[in-house]
Structures are given as C-alpha cells and as structure tokens.
C-alpha cells in the first residue's frame, strides 16, 4: 500500500523559486528529494523527542508508524512544493527554505495544539551521503524558529475535500473475483470462512458485509476513513464477516458515478495506511 511508494525525485536543475510578497525569492535547492531518508540524516533520538512533544498516541514498536508517517508526509510535501513554488507564497508551501535551512510542517500538534516542525540544516560531515541533517522537532513558539519569516503549512492530500466523505448515493462495485480469489487477500480472511466447502458461504458473507458497511457509513459518515494511495484518495469501510466486530477493511475508490472496491486490508494495515494522512478517530480502526 502507500508505504511502497518512495521514488526519488530531484528538483530540476533550473531550480524552483517561491515568489515572496515583497518581490524577493527563496531558492529551493537541487539537493531536495522526495525520500526523507535520502534527503537528510535523521538521528534516532529525534523521534523520541517528537513522541514526547506531540499529543500522545501509539506509534508502534520502535516508532515504526511515526517514521512511515513522516516519510510519507515529507514525500507529499516535496511534491506540493515543487508543483506550487512558482504560484504561491512560502507560507502556503509545506517546505520553507530560509538562510540555508529547511523547515517542514510535520502535520502533528502538541497537547495544546501548536504546530510541530522538523528543522533541517546542511550536513557538514565529510563524505556524508545525505546533504541535510535533521536538527530536531520544534513547536511553533520555540525560539529556534524565530529566524523564519514564514512557517510552512500542513501537507494536504485531497484536492477536493468532498473526496474525504462517503457519498451514500453512489453504489459500490466489488471485484469479487480478485478480493476472494487473490492469494494475498485470502490470507486476511477469517479461517472459519476458508476452504472449498465454504466458498459459497464466504461470497455471501462478503456481499452482505459490503451492504451493511455501506448502510452504516450512510448513517455515520465518519465511519469511512480516508487513505492516500496511487495519488488518489480512497476510503476504508469496516467489514463484519462473522461477528459484529470488524475483521477487514474494504478499500473503495470513487469513479464516475460509483465506488470501485478492489481489495481488503487487515485492520492493522488499514490503520497504518490511514495514519499516513491523519490520526483516525473512529472506534473501529483506532489502536
């Protein structure tokens, strides 16, 4: 899913510049690339500092979910900065370069809802693979950020906010042959529904679960949780196949006049993907 998308993208040699209101320009260096860990050396203690600074949540073993989140957000930030640098002010970009330093809006908040930023400085270590060094994470009121005239904005994933909300008027078309026939998908289905003798039972359970999920999402739109995959917003719906407790998450993508469902995820996979955008608050997917 989204964590597989990590291609290296470098800014064109002409270099991009962001127009400032006063007519000045801020140069975006050619060393910028979309892979956070190719862009900068990130010391492990910085992650622990961020966990302490941010509003508490479960980031998994060794902060694995946090690292995936930062990597995914940074990649999107590079894309948006490249795309919009010549069209908007630096305060509307998720990356700001000022006086040889780089500031990144993590999208995370402190307990008192201050924005948290990642501060990068040039890597002065000889023969360093990465051109930048993660100085640390700082809240917006921290003196370390006073020198920045502009603070970067949050990364956004949906160009149209309506994509984030389930439209109950649209039918769901499921690729049943793939969902119930693909070997990888089958490993996620409850064992009690597996086996040749249960193929009809599995299909009926799946079809019924999809109908029920759509009705529940129509009654409560917050039940549909967004994720970002393949450059598009998808929604995750809970599937209850054998009990009232969700066992799988159905991924649906809006097409022209309907939602296409092509795969199912485990609840853990669904949470990890959804957390790349924001912390899910709906109960069925919360850690």
Model-inferred region functions:
Residues 1-230:
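An acidic, glycine-rich, mixed-charge low-complexity segment common to nucleic-acid enzymes
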């Amino acid at each position: 899913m989204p964590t597989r998308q990590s291609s290296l993208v470098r800014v064109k040699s002409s270099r991009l510049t962001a127009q400032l209101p006063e007519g000045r320009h801020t140069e975006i260096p050619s060393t910028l690339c979309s892979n956070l860990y190719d862009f900068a050396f990130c010391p492990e203690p910085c992650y622990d500092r961020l966990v302490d600074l941010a509003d508490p949540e479960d980031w998994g073993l060794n902060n694995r979910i946090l690292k995936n989140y930062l990597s995914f957000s940074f990649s999107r930030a590079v894309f948006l900065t490249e795309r919009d640098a010549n069209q908007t002010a630096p305060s509307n970009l998720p990356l700001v370069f000022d006086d040889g330093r780089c500031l990144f809006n993590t999208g995370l908040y402190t307990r008192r809802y201050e924005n948290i930023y990642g501060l990068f400085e040039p890597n002065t270590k000889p023969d360093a693979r990465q051109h930048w060094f993660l100085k640390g994470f700082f809240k917006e009121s921290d003196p370390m950020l006073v020198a920045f005239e502009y603070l970067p904005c949050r990364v956004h994933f949906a160009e149209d906010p309506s994509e984030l909300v389930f439209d109950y008027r649209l039918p769901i078309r499921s690729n049943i042959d793939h969902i119930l026939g693909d070997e990888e998908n089958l490993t996620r289905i409850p064992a009690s529904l597996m086996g040749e003798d249960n193929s009809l039972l599995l299909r009926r359970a799946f079809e019924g679960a999809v109908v029920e999920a759509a009705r529940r999402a129509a009654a409560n739109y917050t039940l549909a949780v967004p994720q970002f995959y393949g450059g598009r917003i998808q929604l995750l719906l809970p599937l209850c196949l054998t009990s009232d407790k969700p066992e799988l998450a159905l991924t649906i993508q809006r097409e022209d006049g309907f939602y296409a469902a092509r795969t199912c995820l485990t609840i853990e996979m669904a949470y990890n993907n959804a957390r790349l955008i924001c912390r899910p608050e709906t109960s069925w997917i919360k850690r």
